[in-house]
């Protein structure tokens, strides 16, 4: 019992010493952490970064990190959606600037313009030093208001002098128009081959499934062709099938099996590969021999053609029918007949389905409009046709009037209804815009403006002008109806309607601006006449 009494104080002493040691160790570690937290930021960041450098970040981790930081850690390529958003914001900014410059009040809701497609909205399909082929994005991608155009696409290709676009066929009907230079187009069918010479303003239909190739025989001018494509298999999508293999495109023969090819050509596969498909090893050797630069220039679907080959390809080609009755297969010129509307401010040419058998079954019309600098194509609308318009040359702007969706009106019953919407945009070469049926439109040319139009659902379409002395539907309203329709008196309405003596095209400057311009020129003339010399 005495021994237990002696050991108990000793045990308590030992436990106390252990407790003090534990507390001392905890304090020491705490001081170490405090010292570590006061290290230089560079050293701490470097220490924290070391483990991350052991493996590269994934694209997902990089995007998440950029979102957390608020800005990307390095410049990255914009996606197609981001580019579209950027262009839409640019167009909206241009519209606001345009309204401020014009100084006119806007009675329309502020909307982005889904009917205008800048030239930047084309997607390149093929490109090399000899030319390029590109296609406009689908019309219905931007708005469901253009759903009826989902099976129509715009294709453009450009090629340098003395070049050839290799033979191909497509699962789409084409209606093409030459907008610059000259072309020789050969269409091949099972029983015949026909070549046509096309010049500026000539149009031609290439039926779906027909093998064709396009030559630029000119020594100086570039060739520019715009095509309206109407896909057959899948609405809005079409494909080109090439018999030859290039760096841009595989031959459709390469899709068949070895046994099928040998049975088809009754020849060994090695021979077929050498003649048609091409041997990859030989192609690589040929590229090295000629040099990579020359290879990049010649390889592809657009190739250089010699003078001798051009003479053979153009020898038996037929030209446009001119003012004769259009044939079932040959080219026709959009300006071969007299314009349907014409005055000193512009000309309007049109080929309707009933006047040309090539576009009759497609229910398509073609228009070519020339608006002189400073002139205005008066407001009008189409009764049935939807027009896809290509800006061939020049600059200007247009105003398109639409109506707000009925669904939006229901959702906004408590708001003041502003049903009329004005879509406007500046136009430059290569732009595309759509004119829906029934939507009034006017086009103003700031320089000589040339427009090519494809009319969809064009049979029995009627163009109704809203101003001018001829074909003016407002002018045909009864006098009594005018009094009931407009706030002005019948006399005022009649005087206003008859005030515009021009038809179809007119001076784009308001009368007040014309008077101010005349007064400025008069004052300038008087000052000039008073000079001492």
UniProtKB/Swiss-Prot annotation:
Q: What segment(s) does the record annotate as region Disordered?
A: 37-123, 315-337, 503-533
Query: Mind listing the GO molecular function terms for this protein?
Result: nutrient reservoir activity
Q: Could you say which residues form the signal peptide?
A: 1-30
Q: Where is the Cupin type-1 domain?
A: 115-273, 332-494
Residues folding into a coiled coil are none
| Glycosylation: residue positions | 363, 444
Compositionally biased, Basic and acidic residues: which spans?
37-51, 79-99
Family, according to the entry, reads as follows:
Belongs to the 7S seed storage protein family.
Q: What does the miscellaneous comment read?
A: Conglutin beta is characterized by a broad microheterogeneity with almost a continuum of polypeptides ranging in molecular mass from 15 to 72 KDa. Blad, the major 20 KDa polypeptide, may be considered as a stable, intermediary product of conglutin beta catabolism. The initial characterization of blad was made on a seed storage protein extract containing both conglutin beta 1 and 2.
Quote the protein name from its UniProt record.
Conglutin beta 2
């Amino acid at each position: 019992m005495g021994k237990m009494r002696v050991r108990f104080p000793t045990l308590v002493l030992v436990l106390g010493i252990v407790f003090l040691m534990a507390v001392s160790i905890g304090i020491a570690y705490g001081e170490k952490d405090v010292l570590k937290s006061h290290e230089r930021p560079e050293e701490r960041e470097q220490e924290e970064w070391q483990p991350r450098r052991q493996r590269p970040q994934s694209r997902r981790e990089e995007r998440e990190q950029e979102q957390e930081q608020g800005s990307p850690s390095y410049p990255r390529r914009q996606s197609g959606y981001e580019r579209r958003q950027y262009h839409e914001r640019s167009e909206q900014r241009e519209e606001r600037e345009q309204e401020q410059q014009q100084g006119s009040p806007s009675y329309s809701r502020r909307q982005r313009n889904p009917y205008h497609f800048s030239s930047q909205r084309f997607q390149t399909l093929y490109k090399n030093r000899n030319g390029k082929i590109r296609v406009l994005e689908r019309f219905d991608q931007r708005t469901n208001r253009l759903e009826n155009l989902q099976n129509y696409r715009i294709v453009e290709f450009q090629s340098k002098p003395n070049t050839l676009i290799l033979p191909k066929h497509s699962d789409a009907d084409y209606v093409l128009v030459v907008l610059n230079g000259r072309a020789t187009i050969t269409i091949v069918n099972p029983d015949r081959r026909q070549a046509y010479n096309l010049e500026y303003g000539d149009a031609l239909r290439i039926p779906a499934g027909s093998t064709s190739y396009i030559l630029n025989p000119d020594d100086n001018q570039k060739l520019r062709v715009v095509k309206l494509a109407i896909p057959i298999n899948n609405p809005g999508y079409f494909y080109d099938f090439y018999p030859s293999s290039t760096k841009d495109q595989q031959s459709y023969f390469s899709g068949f099996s070895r046994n099928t090819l040998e049975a088809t050509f009754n020849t060994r596969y090695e021979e077929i590969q050498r003649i048609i498909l091409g041997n990859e090893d030989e192609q690589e050797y040929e590229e090295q021999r000629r040099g990579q630069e020359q290879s990049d220039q010649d390889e592809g679907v657009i190739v250089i053609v010699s003078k001798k080959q051009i003479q053979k390809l153009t020898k038996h080609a037929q030209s446009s029918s001119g003012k004769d009755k259009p044939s079932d297969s040959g080219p026709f010129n959009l300006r071969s007949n007299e314009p349907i509307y014409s005055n000193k401010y512009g000309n309007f040419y049109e080929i309707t389905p009933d006047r040309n058998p090539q576009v009759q079954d497609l229910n398509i019309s073609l228009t070519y409009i020339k608006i002189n600098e400073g002139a205005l194509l008066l407001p009008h609308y189409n009764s049935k046709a939807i027009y896809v318009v290509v800006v061939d040359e020049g600059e200007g702007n247009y105003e398109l009037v639409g109506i707000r969706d009925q669904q939006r009106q229901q959702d906004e019953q408590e708001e003041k209804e502003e049903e009329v919407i004005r879509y406007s945009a500046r136009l430059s070469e290569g732009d595309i815009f759509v004119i829906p049926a029934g939507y009034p439109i006017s086009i103003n040319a700031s320089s000589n403006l040339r427009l090519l139009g494809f009319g969809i659902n064009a049979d029995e379409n009627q163009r109704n002008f809203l101003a001018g002395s001829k074909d003016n539907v407002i002018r045909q309203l009864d006098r009594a109806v005018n009094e009931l329709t407009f706030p002005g008196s019948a006399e005022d309405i009649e005087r206003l309607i008859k005030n515009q003596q021009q038809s179809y095209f007119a001076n784009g400057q308001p009368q007040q601006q014309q008077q101010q311009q005349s007064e400025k020129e008069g004052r300038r003339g008087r000052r000039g006449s008073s000079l001492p010399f």
